[in-house]
C-alpha cells in the first residue's frame, strides 16, 4: 500500500499519472481509452493507493503523522510513503535560513520513517549547475548538503539533448548507506505515459561504452568524487 502526498499538483493530476503508468496508455488518451485503462487497473495486482493533496508550504510532519494515524485506524497499513516533495513542506521549528529549514524537514521525515518502520521517498530539483550536466551529482542538487547529510539513499535522473530525442536517460546512484554508490544505469523514459524504466542487462551492456565515457569525463573533472 502506498500513500502519496502532493504539495504541487492536484490529486486528480497525480492520479492520472498513475493510471497512465500502470496501464501504459498515454496521458492524452486516458479519456478516449478509458475502457483499456479500467481493464489494466483491474488486472493490476499491486496494493492500494491513497493520494492526499496539501497546499504548497502548508504541511509539516505533524500533518503527515495525523493523516497516517487516521489511515492506520481505518485498517489501511501503508508500506511506502511518497512525499511530492519535501522541499515544499514546512518545518515544525522556526528557522532563519532556508537551508536550515530544509535540513529540519528531512530530519523530521527520516525520524518518522524510522519510528513507523516505513520507507519515505521524496524528490528534489537541481541547482543551476545541474541544468546542463550529463550526470547529476550531490553538488548539483539544490541545497544539497542539508539533504544529503540526512538521506540514506539518493539517486538522480538526467537527460542530455540526444537522450531526450530517443526517450532515454541516466539513473545515477549518488549516495547509498547500505550498498554500492557511484553507479550509472541507462533508463527508458516515456514522458507520455509517466514511465521511467531501468534497462535490462543486455540493453545496458550496449550502452556501457557511452555511459562509462560520460562517467569518466565527470569523474576526471570533479574533486572529491565518492
Show the residue positions of the predicted features.
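Cytosolic-facing regulatory segments adjacent to core modules
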Residues: 1-77, 91, 185-186
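Structural recognition of the conserved hydrophobic beta-strand(s) that form the central parallel beta-sheet
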Residues: 4, 82-83, 118-125
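Cofactor-binding loop segments of dinucleotide-utilizing enzymes, especially the Rossmann-like FAD-
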Residues: 7, 125, 159
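Helical mechanochemical/support elements of P-loop NTPase systems and associated helical scaffolds
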Residues: 10-14, 33-36, 57-64, 82, ...
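Short, glycine/acidic-enriched loop or turn micro-motifs at the edges of active sites
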Residues: 11, 87, 128
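C-terminal regions of RecA-like/P-loop NTPase motor modules
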Residues: 44, 62-78, 114-116, 128-226
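Helical hairpin unit composed of two closely spaced alpha helices linked by a short loop
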Residues: 79-118
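Hydrophobic, well-ordered secondary-structure elements that form the walls
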Residues: 84, 109, 121, 151-152, ...
Amino acid at each position: 500500500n502506498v500513500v502519496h502526498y502532493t504539495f504541487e499538483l492536484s490529486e486528480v493530476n497525480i492520479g492520472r499519472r498513475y493510471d497512465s503508468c500502470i496501464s501504459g496508455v498515454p496521458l492524452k488518451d486516458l479519456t478516449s481509452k478509458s475502457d483499456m485503462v479500467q481493464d489494466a487497473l483491474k488486472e493490476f495486482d499491486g496494493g492500494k493507493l491513497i493520494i492526499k493533496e496539501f497546499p504548497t508550504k502548508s504541511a509539516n510532519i505533524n500533518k503527515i503523522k495525523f493523516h497516517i494515524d487516521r489511515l492506520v485506524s481505518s485498517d489501511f497499513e501503508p508500506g511506502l510513503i511518497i512525499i511530492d516533495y519535501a522541499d515544499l513542506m514546512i518545518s515544525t521549528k522556526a528557522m532563519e535560513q532556508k537551508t536550515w529549514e530544509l535540513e529540519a524537514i528531512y530530519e523530521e521525515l527520516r525520524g518518522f520513517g524510522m519510528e513507523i518502520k516505513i520507507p519515505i521517498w521524496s524528490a528534489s530539483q537541481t541547482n543551476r549547475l545541474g541544468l546542463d550536466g550529463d550526470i547529476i551529482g550531490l553538488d548539483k542538487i539544490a541545497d544539497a548538503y542539508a539533504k544529503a547529510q540526512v538521506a540514506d539513499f539518493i539517486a538522480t535522473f538526467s537527460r542530455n539533448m540526444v537522450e531526450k530525442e530517443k526517450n532515454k536517460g541516466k539513473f545515477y546512484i549518488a549516495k547509498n548507506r547500505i550498498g554500492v554508490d557511484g553507479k550509472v544505469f541507462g533508463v527508458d523514459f516515456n514522458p507520455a505515459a509517466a514511465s521511467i524504466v531501468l534497462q535490462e542487462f543486455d540493453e545496458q551492456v550496449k550502452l556501457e561504452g557511452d555511459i562509462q565515457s560520460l562517467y569518466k569525463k565527470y569523474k576526471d573533472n570533479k574533486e572529491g568524487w565518492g
